[in-house]
């Protein structure tokens, strides 16, 4: 077995050029947000993005939810071993949930890795990289509890128009298939004033959309004793001037209450979109999963949401092949999926995760049976998604243009973005029309539907109806800054986004006033 020392090379003098980095992200939206923090921490420490070139530092932010996450990590590390042998001074860091779980195993399987860090100490990455270079040996640092709330760390957003905002970390649920609570700990809630201050800072930087993140967002407030805190938070965020779109993920059906539905329906900035994880349609399987709701309660939630928000697009998560799942159980899942009419679904084949109660359950379902059921489920959901998308054809929707969503936009002369309900829309740019910038809003008529996206082709080749936004202005200024040319005059008073935002700002008086409405008068000690 080789050692780290065999892979370490002398680093070129810092004066020659800044060291470059690449962050690779696997897993959920929490990981995407974490990677923005890792990127911000690296840039604050003087590293620069490799921008597609071979990087001096490769950081892999891992997921531990499914078995293929392990295979993907070690496959990537095997490839990087050869790259590192010929790339003088290269360093490799592994973080996130799988690193938190496997710890020293990462270094045993891949001794050429320089740094292993966990979910609770992301901010330590630059220090660990420097220590590994100085000492010439791998650095393994895993903490058992949160070192600092991630939103206090520097960040670099992928999308100027949009931002992630963590409202909590960790989870108090005990789902038998899930490893996340063991890796991210018990739920810790941020104070409402801190959350609103971060949203305000994002808006000041040009963002017009935020997504509130938590393992179970609608249990937000458990730490300070307010069961209606999440609904209040939605309303307070919706009052922030300049914030046009609010999304959140993920809620838990057992704790999803009508006050949240009311807040969604009565707050214009909250988008008509809901991600509600089903996991299984079988009550027997839900009980074995320790999902403290049953299928009829789940469908009742969807009915109440659609009563208040008729055009809401509802998405879900479903696991196929949980231990003990029979054909009858699976038929119940198909029944609920047909009744629920999800606009899309994230479907997974059950994967044994050591350390979870489900891993040692009897009656593990054979892989070929799981695969066959998975095929039937995805075929059903694809049909439903197509039918639900076809209902949108002929409607006029507003699309927030993205910089990174459309892979073939250049070949098709289209731009891509998200409708208010979260659906992906590819829209045609007619010859002679102005072209929307990332962050601008475009009003289009949907002309075609596919299972996974909508298309808005120009029927009469008329110019696009573009609403130029502060986010588009911020994107344009950022482009000018990166090219070293003067930025065009801003159309609004909002300043351009810094390349790296250095953590949470201090609160402004107006934000503190808004926060009080969330905290509630019954808990004055928790005011920001």
From Swiss-Prot:
Its cofactor is [4Fe-4S] cluster. It is found in: Cytoplasm. Its main location: cytoplasm. Residues 19-134 form the MTTase N-terminal domain. Residues 390-460 form the TRAM domain. GO terms for cellular component: cytosol. Binds 2 [4Fe-4S] clusters. One cluster is coordinated with 3 cysteines and an exchangeable S-adenosyl-L-methionine. Keywords: 4Fe-4S, Cytoplasm, Iron, Iron-sulfur, Metal-binding, S-adenosyl-L-methionine, Transferase, tRNA processing. It is an enzyme of class 2 (transferase). Belongs to the methylthiotransferase family. MiaB subfamily. Catalyzes the methylthiolation of N6-(dimethylallyl)adenosine (i(6)A), leading to the formation of 2-methylthio-N6-(dimethylallyl)adenosine (ms(2)i(6)A) at position 37 in tRNAs that read codons beginning with uridine. This is tRNA-2-methylthio-N(6)-dimethylallyladenosine synthase.
